[in-house]
């Protein structure tokens, strides 16, 4: 292989995008924008969980880090609760864990988009559920449907 052929191969390989890079490019080329952090008073973009599937978290990195460290950000109200909001049984079943027990298991609480659409990242569409209630709610409502419009996969 000549040096010229080698340079052409390197240039060609730089042009190839991974599936995640392709998905990000497609997302942005369609005019989409990342949702804003769900926390009141924060105007940062959310963290991308996985570009390949257009999967986004509900919060920005700054808010996630501050919340996990128990720090307050001036003029920002953290939306995520320190208990499962299904403690009243509004999902049609009661959360099996008592509200006062969550303080030692905060990593087992998720932010759930009620309509299943992660682009609709408004406080009235996002609730805190434990992993047990979140999984059951998602299964019952079809949020796990990989063909829903808010989910994307590039073949």
What are these regions (language model features)?
Residues 51-66, 96-103, 125-129, 133:
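Cysteine-rich micro-motifs
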Residues 11, 33-65:
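BZIP DNA-binding basic region
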Residues 2-28, 151-155:
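Short, intrinsically disordered terminal segments enriched in charged and Pro/Gly residues
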Residues 13-25, 41, 61-72, 109-116:
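Short Cys/His-rich Zn2+-coordinating modules
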Residues 48-58, 73-77, 110-127:
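Short linker/helix segments within small regulatory modules
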Residues 65-68, 126-150:
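Short Cys/His-centered divalent metal-binding micro-motifs
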Residues 35-46, 70-109, 130-132:
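Short cysteine-rich loop/turn motifs with clustered Cys
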Residues 93-128, 146-150:
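Histidine-centered nuclease catalytic patch
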């Amino acid at each position: 292989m000549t040096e010229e052929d080698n340079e052409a191969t390197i240039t060609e390989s730089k042009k190839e995008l991974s599936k995640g890079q392709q998905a990000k490019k497609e997302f942005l080329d369609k005019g989409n924008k990342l949702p804003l952090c769900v926390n009141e008073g924060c105007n940062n973009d959310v963290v991308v969980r996985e570009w390949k599937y257009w999967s986004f978290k509900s919060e920005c990195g700054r808010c996630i880090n501050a919340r996990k460290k128990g720090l307050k950000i001036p003029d920002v109200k953290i939306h995520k609760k320190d208990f499962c909001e299904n403690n009243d049984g509004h999902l049609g079943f009661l959360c099996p864990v008592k509200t006062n027990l969550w303080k030692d298991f905060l990593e087992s609480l998720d932010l759930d988009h009620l309509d299943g659409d992660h682009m609709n990242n408004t406080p009235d569409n996002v609730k805190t559920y434990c992993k047990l209630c979140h999984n059951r709610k998602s299964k019952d409502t079809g949020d796990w449907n990989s063909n829903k419009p808010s989910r994307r996969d590039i073949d």
